[in-house]
């Protein structure tokens, strides 16, 4: 748990344990389980507390070897905005491969999927909409003909035009958009996929 210089944080150990338990419900049929290996450590550091992805070296200075290091911070600055979680795809940054950073505000949620989403990235899963964060800009075709080279590059995942809160119903979690792919076919994305933004 990262605190400010005075030891103040907005998250409790119980909230973190609940987040891990929620992530484990998604992993139940996969024979994987997230466990806390030791006592939860506290790091008092203002710069790390308000984490910016440009400050990655601060993470590595505090890492424990041979485990996944989870950092719970007050905020994550990412480009021109903020992120709920942050990690590295395998092979991109070996030095930081065993790190997940979580925004405290995205953790205190009874149906949070941010932690398991970030573990998905750790296991080399991409977003279901692919590389772009621009709405309706995925290059994957609805018919799946380019599924191995576009979108998330997983062929059993339907093409996703970047589903999010603005095009998913808060009542039934159904996609409400009317975007079409390059062939004019309507997207029918899976809103329950943890690697989507729904």
What are these regions (language model features)?
Residues 1-68, 72-77:
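Propeptide-to-catalytic entry region of secreted or membrane-anchored zinc metalloproteases
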Residues 5-11, 98-101, 198:
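Short, exposed beta-strand "edge-strand" segments with a Pro/Gly-rich flavor and a Y/T-containing core
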Residues 12-13, 61, 93-98, 148, ...:
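Glycine-rich, flexible loop segments associated with nucleotide phosphate handling
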Residues 17, 27, 32, 48, ...:
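Generic detector of leucine side chains in alpha-helical contexts
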Residues 17-20, 24, 99, 113-116, ...:
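Extracytoplasmic/secreted envelope proteins and their assembly/folding machinery
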Residues 21-24, 53-60, 84-92, 168-185:
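Intrinsically disordered, low-complexity boundary segments flanking structured domains
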Residues 57-135:
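Active-site-proximal segment of zinc-dependent metalloprotease catalytic domains
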Residues 105-198:
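The catalytic-center signature of Zn2+-dependent metalloproteases
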């Amino acid at each position: 748990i990262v605190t400010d210089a005075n030891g103040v944080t907005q998250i409790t150990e119980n909230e973190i344990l609940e987040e891990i338990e929620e992530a484990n419900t998604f992993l139940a049929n996969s024979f994987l389980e997230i466990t806390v290996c030791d006592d939860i450590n506290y790091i008092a550091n203002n710069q790390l507390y308000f984490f910016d992805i440009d400050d990655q070296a601060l993470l590595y200075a505090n890492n424990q070897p041979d485990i996944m290091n989870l950092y719970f911070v007050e905020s994550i600055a990412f480009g021109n905005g903020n992120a709920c979680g942050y990690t590295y795809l395998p092979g991109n940054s070996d030095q930081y491969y065993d790190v997940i950073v979580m925004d405290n505000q995205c953790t205190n949620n009874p149906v949070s999927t941010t932690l398991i989403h970030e573990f998905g990235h750790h296991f080399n899963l991409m977003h279901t909409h692919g590389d772009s964060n621009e709405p309706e800009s995925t290059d994957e075709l609805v018919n799946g003909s380019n599924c191995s080279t576009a979108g998330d590059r997983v062929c059993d995942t339907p093409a996703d035009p970047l589903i999010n809160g603005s095009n998913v119903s808060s009542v039934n979690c159904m996609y409400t958009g009317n975007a079409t792919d390059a062939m004019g076919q309507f997207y029918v994305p899976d809103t329950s996929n943890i690697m989507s933004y729904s």
